[in-house]
C-alpha cells in the first residue's frame, strides 16, 4: 500500500493553500497594527490572542472530529479561519482585531489537529514518519511561499484580505474529491491528553514543544516588528522572514536523519545550542542572513525532533493522544512567548526578543544536559 495515497495527497494540497494564507496574515498583522500606531504591548497581546485561539481550537477539535468526521471538521475549520480573515476588514481597532485574531487562531488550530490526526489514522507504524515529514515540508513550503508573496504584492489591508480569504476557501476544494476515514478513532478515546502530559519518560519531549512554541511564537509574532523598528521596509521584511522559514525547510530532512542516526537527545542538544548562537549573532547585528539562517534551521526543526522524542516513549494506541498533548504544549508556549516578550520589548529594548529566545533555550539545554542519555527503550516509532 502506497504511503502517499490519494486522500493524503489531496489533504496536503489543501493544507498548502491554507498555510499560504496563514503565513501572509501572521507576517502582516503586526505591521498593520504598527501602522495604526498601536504600542508594542498591544501588538503582542493581539498575537497572544491568536495563540489563545490556537489553544481553544486544539482542545475542541477532538470532540468535533468524533461528532462529524475528518472531512466536515476540515470544512468547518477552514470556514472559521476564513471568517477570522474577513473580519479584520470590518473594523480596525485593538479590541476588534483581538477578537478576529482569536477566531482565526481557533480555525488554524482546528486545521492542524484535523490534518495531523487524519495523517496519523491514515498511516501505519512504518510510514507515519514519512507522512509527518511530508506534513512539515508542506507546512514550511507554504509558509515560505507566503513570505515571498508578502515581498511581491501590495501589503495594504484591503488589498490583501480578499485574496487571502479566497485562498482559505480554495483550500477546501481538494477535500471535496475524497473522503478521509476515521477508522481508528475509537481506539484512541480511552487515552487522555492529561495522562500524556504527565508521562515522565516523555517530559523532555513535552518541554521541548513548549520551548519551541515560545521561540517560534516570538519569531512569528514579533520578528516583523523588530525589523520594522530597525527601518526595514515591508517588502524586505517578507524577504527576511522567507530566509528564516527557508532555513527551516532545508533543515527538516537532514536533521531528521541525524536524529535517527545519532539519537534525538544529542541532536536536541546541538539544535538548542545553535539557537542560542543564532540569537547572539542577531544581537551583535553581524551578518543577518547567516544568523537568521542558522536560527531558522535549528529553531524550526526543534518541534518535530522533540515530538518524535515523546512519541517513541508511548504505545501505538497512545500516539494520537500524545500528538494532541504535544500540540497543546506548543500552543501554550506560543501563547506565553509573544505576550511576555512584547512587554519586555516595550519597556526595555527590541533586543529583548533575542535575549528571551536565548534564555529559554539555555534553560532547555540545561534540562537536556541533566539527562544522562540512559533512556528507556522506545516502545513506538512514528
Swiss-Prot record:
What keywords are annotated for this sequence in UniProt?
Answer: Cell inner membrane, Cell membrane, Membrane, Transmembrane, Transmembrane helix, Transport
Q: Does the keyword Transmembrane helix apply?
A: yes
Query: Where would you find this protein in the cell?
Result: Cell inner membrane
Name which cysteines form disulfide bonds.
none
CDD domains given for it? MFS_YcaD_like
Q: Name one Pfam family in it.
A: MFS_1
- One GO CC annotation, please? plasma membrane
Q: How does it sit in the membrane?
A: Multi-pass membrane protein
Record family assignment: Belongs to the major facilitator superfamily. YcaD (TC 2.A.1.26) family.
The name under which this protein is listed is Uncharacterized MFS-type transporter YcaD
Q: Which gene encodes it?
A: ycaD
